Amino acid sequence: MIYEREIYLTDPAEKAKVVEFLNGFGLTFTGNIEYTMGLFSDGELVGTGSLGGRVMRDIAIKESFQHKGLTHRIIRNLKSESMRRGIVGNQIFTKPQNVPVFEHMGFKCVAVAEPYAALLESGQDTLEDYLTRIRSLLGSGEGKNRGAIVMNCNPFTLGHRSLVEYALNNCDEVIIFAVQEDRSVFPFADRFTLIKQGVKDMRGVQVVSGGDYIISNATFPTYFIKGTEELSAQTTLDATIFATRIAPALNISVRFVGEEPSDKTTLAYNEAMRRVFSNNGIDFKVVPRVQKGDQVISASAVRKALADNDMETIRRMVPKTTLTYFSSEEGKRVIERIKLEDKIKELQAKEKAEKEAASKKVEAEAKKTKK
């Protein structure tokens, strides 16, 4: 008899069983997991599935128990738990060949990024719901040359503003999609406000949330593909959703990005966009980054300056609206967090260096002893 129950991830032994089970399927049990369930036969784990927010993930069934309707049981369990948590719509990732399986369970395919991944969804708060909301805010955009920029702005800098100015000089309208995923040191609500304040004097610029479909936990799945394929899967899926669903619905003809000479993820993302957009008739413009003297303006440079109390550098890199925010209570709390995280990194680096030095000393002593 097969029974199902929650797997308590706070129990190391329970979690270890799930990790080992998923490893057998080439799945990595990492990331923002809030709930995991298991199917058991005579005490043996034979199937599992998890929730990370509204995303269903890490669904796997032991080979000898497949084709017995157990996938339906896992999905039913995860949907029930989602409803208990107030989640009215789910998303799921799978490999392209598995799309028909989940379509038979009522999921609709959002996009497929061959040969890596597919995103499906069911319930409310779907991509169409998101696009309907955004269209009501923006208007149709018909007859206009409409461009788009996706920004995280952690925080908003003069470099971001320069990118918007460049886009506006080349388009009738510019839509800024603010990355909604709250994994940055500056909270989404604060970043969204900083962007709006930073461009409020620019006619033809509108700021909207990127929702669950632009650089989010939904479009950047990090858990079911190992090795070098992971980054290609993430970037290609995100670019495909934008090119095939978002851009056509909002009459976007061009997307602008800032030049990124060194960050591996951003370089891969830009390359994926260049490839996918060219196949879908969307222009892709890479804009050189702005410098102040010999220093490139970047959000990471601003965060470093905040950690170092380097107000001279900060004033050179951010607009007055961002500078004013730094003096607010919300801004001060974020700055304290930045300083704390910077201090922790310093201590960790020091500890690592000391361990390496001690290890080298032991090795040197051992060599002397052998002689």
Model-derived features with residue positions:
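Short amphipathic alpha-helix that is part of the acyltransferase structural core
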Residues: 1-29, 40
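Conserved beta-hairpin
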Residues: 34-47
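Short hydrophobic beta-strand motif reused across regulatory alpha/beta modules
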Residues: 49-51, 108
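A short, internal acetyl-CoA/4′-phosphopantetheine-binding micro-motif in the GNAT/acyltransferase core
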Residues: 56-67
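Conserved acetyl-CoA pyrophosphate-binding loop and the N-cap/start of the following alpha-helix
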Residues: 65, 69-77, 159
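Conserved GNAT acetyl-CoA-binding A-motif
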Residues: 82-95
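Nucleotidyltransferase catalytic core that binds NTPs
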Residues: 94-107, 112-371
